[in-house]
From Swiss-Prot:
It catalyses: tRNA(Phe) + L-phenylalanine + ATP = L-phenylalanyl-tRNA(Phe) + AMP + diphosphate + H(+). Binds 2 magnesium ions per tetramer. Gene3D superfamilies: 1.10.10.2320, 1.10.10.2330, 3.30.1370.240, Bira Bifunctional Protein, Domain 2. It comes from the Archaea. Its cofactor is Mg(2+). Its main location: cytoplasm. Tetramer of two alpha and two beta subunits. This is Phenylalanine--tRNA ligase alpha subunit. It comes from Pyrobaculum calidifontis (strain DSM 21063 / JCM 11548 / VA1). One of its GO terms (cellular component) is cytoplasm.
Length: 488
């Protein structure tokens, strides 16, 4: 009689007909992976038949799991409706209203005058359709094919190919018996003859240990360091500043009024801290305060200017450099993290990286600014770049900078302009002009490396990390040797 390890015996016992291995694993209260070694051993001993079958399955993405928990955007918008007996009215104040409208439009629902107005029966019909879609997302195994295709397009699910392992006993159950597994015998086992009742686990020294891919650096850190190299190669000097910043450098020195909407709590992370903080020089605070009171016509508060925030822009660092260096001809840049209360989605994050730079010198013009921006973009390997007029409180004229993403289309990744006199003169810069810009490096990396979701820049998925590092290596080889130089 053949002696088998207990787990293998249990598999043979339960597999008198073809059965999925994962089903047997559930019965035994173990994982399928833990049984694989015994399956291979059973096949080698001729007591098991093994058949591998392949099937396509659908799994929720991170976004899909979020929608199962919180609801689809269109579902949440419809549930916010105010209804009477005849009609339902939906105000478009929900933060996800634009995304919800895009999906509701496919059902013939369109807004008028900033609201959606539907008859009661149409509302209930549309809501029932969305509820069916919500249930299908939560139960993918029974979801109709057309909804699965829609979920794929919306990146709520992903298609995966699974390998299903089926096993069947190849020997009669009465020809095998379970035994205790032993990897070492004692002298007592040998003397008493008990070793005959044990299953002695064989050692196969020819088996190679499992191969693991070599670790690679994080592709996004490599990208940020490469941007530093490019900027230094273009004649810029790097400066650094604190993440925890006083409002003065983050807002006031940039001519943003103290009642500006960007300084509200829904756009800025305020930090409560009773300890010491670095105060700006008194003469700068007085000069900036005078400009605010003269131009914006309100009573400027030095106490508010000393409140602490997590910096919302790295311009706080370049404006510090401008205040320290004053007049002259120089170029500086900084790369750092900034923080804003954004809702996390494929294009937005509450924490991201900015490249901020300034060029200081007499006689600089808007043409110089656009030329400098285009030169940096080309040095980083961007294809098509375009500019659109924009408004920022501290620059004039101003532009937004766009680049073409392979799948997302034109993506805005930065703003730029010439610092207004209200910014430069209180800092003592009266004869030079200052070209300034801030770029979102997370979006730049997405454009250059073909990444569709900003959250993937910080993914823990090892397969994705290796894939993106391979893209980074290809990008660096193709762009990193151009050696573009630019002088201004």
């Amino acid at each position: 009689m053949l002696v088998l390890p207990p787990p293998l015996y249990e598999i043979v016992k339960r597999a008198q007909e073809w059965r999925p291995l994962d089903e047997i694993a559930r019965e035994l209260g173990v994982t399928q992976e833990s049984l694989m070694r015994y399956v291979e051993e059973g096949r080698a001993k001729g007591v098991l038949q093994v058949d591998k079958r392949y099937a396509v399955a659908y799994e929720l993405t991170e976004e899909g799991a979020l929608r199962v928990r919180e609801g689809l955007p269109e579902y949440k918008l419809l549930k916010a409706a105010v209804c009477d007996e005849a009609r339902c009215v939906i105000e478009l104040k929900h933060p996800e209203a634009p995304l919800a409208l895009a999906n509701l439009a496919k059902l013939g629902v369109k807004p008028r005058g900033g609201v959606i107005e539907l008859s009661r029966d149409v509302y209930e019909r549309v809501l029932a359709s969305i509820e069916e879609k919500q249930r299908a997302l939560a139960q993918l195994d029974s979801a109709p094919p057309d909804l699965l295709q829609e979920f794929l397009r919306r990146k709520l699910v992903k298609k995966v190919e699974k390998t299903l392992i089926y096993v069947k006993a190849a020997a009669p159950l009465d020809s095998v018996k379970p035994a205790e597994v032993k990897t070492a015998l004692t002298s007592e086992d040998i003397a008493t003859g008990r070793w005959r009742e044990y299953y002695l686990k064989p050692f196969d020294l020819s088996i190679e240990p499992p191969q693991y891919p070599a670790p690679v650096p994080h592709f996004f850190n490599e990208f940020l360091n490469y941007v530093r190299e490019v900027m230094v190669g273009l004649g810029f000097e790097e400066v650094r500043g604190p993440i925890l910043e006083v409002e003065f450098w983050n807002f006031d020195a940039l001519f943003q009024a103290q009642d500006h909407p960007a300084r509200e709590v829904h756009d800025t992370f305020y930090v409560h801290w009773d300890g010491p903080r670095e105060e700006p020089p008194r003469h700068l605070m007085e000069a900036v305060g005078r400009v605010h009171e003269e131009k914006w016509r309100y009573k400027w508060s030095p106490q508010k200017a000393l409140n602490l925030v997590l910096r919302t822009q790295t311009t706080a660092t370049t404006i510090r450099a401008l205040a320290e260096r004053g007049e002259g001809a120089y170029k500086v840049f900084t790369i750092g993290r900034v923080f804003r209360p954004e809702k996390l989605d494929p294009k937005h994050s509450m924490e991201f990286h900015q490249l901020d730079g300034i060029v200081v010198g007499p006689g600089l013009t808007f043409k110089h600014l656009l030329g400098q921006l285009e030169q940096i973009a080309k040095a980083l390997g961007m294809g098509r770049v375009k500019f659109r007029p924009a408004y920022f409180p501290f620059t004039s004229p101003s532009v937004e900078v766009y680049a073409e993403h392979p799948t997302l289309g034109w993506v805005e990744f930065g703003g730029a302009g010439i610092f207004r006199p209200e910014v430069t003169e209180p800092l003592g810069v009266k004869n030079s002009r200052v070209l300034a810009w801030g770029w979102g490096l997370d979006r730049v990396a997405m454009i250059l490396l073909g990444i569709d979701d900003i959250r993937d820049l910080f993914t823990k998925d090892l397969d994705k990390l290796r894939e993106y590092y391979a893209r980074w290596e290809k990008y660096r080889r193709g762009v990193g040797t151009r050696g573009i130089k630019y002088t201004l």
